[in-house]
């Protein structure tokens, strides 16, 4: 009866809006909540809500109340059992029981360079890169001319002292 009274008081435009709301109720829910919050806070922050918006808000509020009444779970103690009883897991005899992860033996305090390669490898690479960088800077020096372009830095020319050094440059 309340909904009927409200519908009678709505204009044709409002009924079109209501049909749109009915078709897109999920999208309208956010707007309804927005209007409802603003209506409740209108004492501190006055807001201009049109009568049409107010009536739509009342209709949606009434419909939500009816929906909640009809779809409420029956009162009583909460269900403790799931809908389908779970079967206990039975381990077959040929399956290995799961063991907790064990870290392989080794010194955890070793730095990455010692594990992957020698400790001084990255330092040597840095010095060689620095030499090449200086060589490239020297290429732009006009006093040395074309001869400086053909010469490599001294450290790059000589062979490495370590035979197992993977970063050495051999001529």
Swiss-Prot record:
The keyword Transport does not apply. Residues 161-171 have a biased composition (Acidic residues). Residues 68-112, 152-171 are annotated as: Disordered. It is found in: Virion. The keyword Coiled coil does not apply. Induction: Expressed in the late phase of the viral replicative cycle. It comes from the Viruses. GO terms for cellular component: virion component. Keywords: Late protein, Virion. Belongs to the asfivirus H171R family. This is Uncharacterized protein H171R. It comes from African swine fever virus (strain Badajoz 1971 Vero-adapted).
């Amino acid at each position: 009866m309340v909904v009927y009274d409200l519908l009678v008081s709505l204009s044709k435009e409002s009924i079109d809006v209501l049909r749109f709301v009915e078709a897109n109720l999920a999208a309208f829910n956010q707007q309804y909540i927005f209007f409802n919050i603003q209506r409740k806070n209108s004492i501190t922050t006055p807001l201009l809500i049109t009568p049409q918006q107010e009536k739509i808000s009342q209709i949606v509020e009434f419909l939500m109340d009816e929906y909640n009444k009809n779809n409420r779970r029956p009162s009583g103690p909460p269900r403790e059992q799931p809908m389908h009883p779970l079967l206990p897991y039975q381990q077959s005899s040929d399956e290995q029981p799961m063991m907790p992860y064990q870290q392989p033996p080794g010194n955890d305090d070793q730095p990455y360079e010692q594990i992957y390669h020698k400790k001084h490898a990255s330092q040597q690479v840095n010095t060689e890169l620095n030499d090449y960088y200086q060589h490239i800077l020297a290429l732009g020096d006009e006093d040395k001319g074309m001869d400086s372009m053909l010469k490599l830095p001294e450290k790059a020319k000589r062979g490495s002292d370590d035979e197992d050094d993977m970063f050495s440059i051999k001529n």
